[in-house]
Amino acid sequence: MFWFKNVMIYRLTSPLSLESSSLEEQLRQTKFSPCSQSDISKFGWSSPLSGSELLHFSQGKQFLLVSHKEDKLLPTNVIKKETEERIAVLEEKEARKLKKTEKQAIKDDVVAMLLPRAFSKHQFTAIWLDLDAQLVYVDAGSSKRAEDTLALLRKTLGSLPVVPISFALLPSEVMTNWIAKGHTPNWLSLLEEAELKSFDTDSVIRCKRQDLESEEIAQHLQAGKFVTKLAIDWENHFSCVLNEDATLSRVKFADEVREKNDDILKEDIAQRFDADFLLMTEELKLFTQKMIEEFGGIKERI
């Protein structure tokens, strides 16, 4: 099961509905295929469930997809060295300086020569569509990685009107008040890690193994710094770092959660996957609702 380790949430700005069979047909048009000897990169959809040929997994209006990106690893220093050597030999032979286009052609030849021997890097990115709430969750630690997968889905579906979720209250201000005013919600506890930022001076303070209720932290907040990252624990559910853009990083589900389906035999991969997906999505749905409440509701963009 693709237990999310990072969470980036997007809101659909126009209603989206999907039907399993037609979605599968669309996904097959952009199915992942491995790099050939001449390819430097490939990007497409892979099956979320090991051993299944389906390119999506669904439960009612919940859909899970997994993008698969393969990049050939070509060391830039090797390409540069080989290219420069070839250029030097040709310039000496012809007693002239090569044009920019000629140098690029030589570089392209070097890349083509190295590609068949290059190692591959594979990257899988899970994306969950909660069409009941019209929200999209991406397991990505960077906006670029999330946007790449969303762009692939947009290409697959023909349209995907989404924006990053935003709230009536700024998460950084709310998190700052949790610490400065002792307004931490009773359903979560603060861990000893945070990032404080001054938007006037761009100064940044990163705290680890630090009592966030200490006088030292209080002084930083009184001086005008805001909390931009905060490690939190939702007891018996999961811990994570909550960021100022409401994304979650380093999500770690509690053992109590991950072990709930241990009564299902390991050999029954499909049933365990189904149960774990339901479990994970219910946890994240509940947390999202709590975030919406704490941050004053979803802000509808014009």
Curated annotation (Swiss-Prot):
It is found in: Cytoplasm, Nucleoid. GO terms for molecular function: double-stranded DNA binding. The keyword Cytoplasm applies. Keywords: Cytoplasm, DNA recombination. GO terms for biological process: DNA recombination; regulation of DNA recombination. The keyword Cytoplasm applies. GO terms for cellular component: bacterial nucleoid; cytoplasm. It holds the Pfam family RdgC. Belongs to the RdgC family. May be involved in recombination. This is Recombination-associated protein RdgC. It comes from Actinobacillus pleuropneumoniae serotype 7 (strain AP76). The lineage of its organism: Bacteria, Pseudomonadati, Pseudomonadota, Gammaproteobacteria, Pasteurellales. The gene is rdgC.
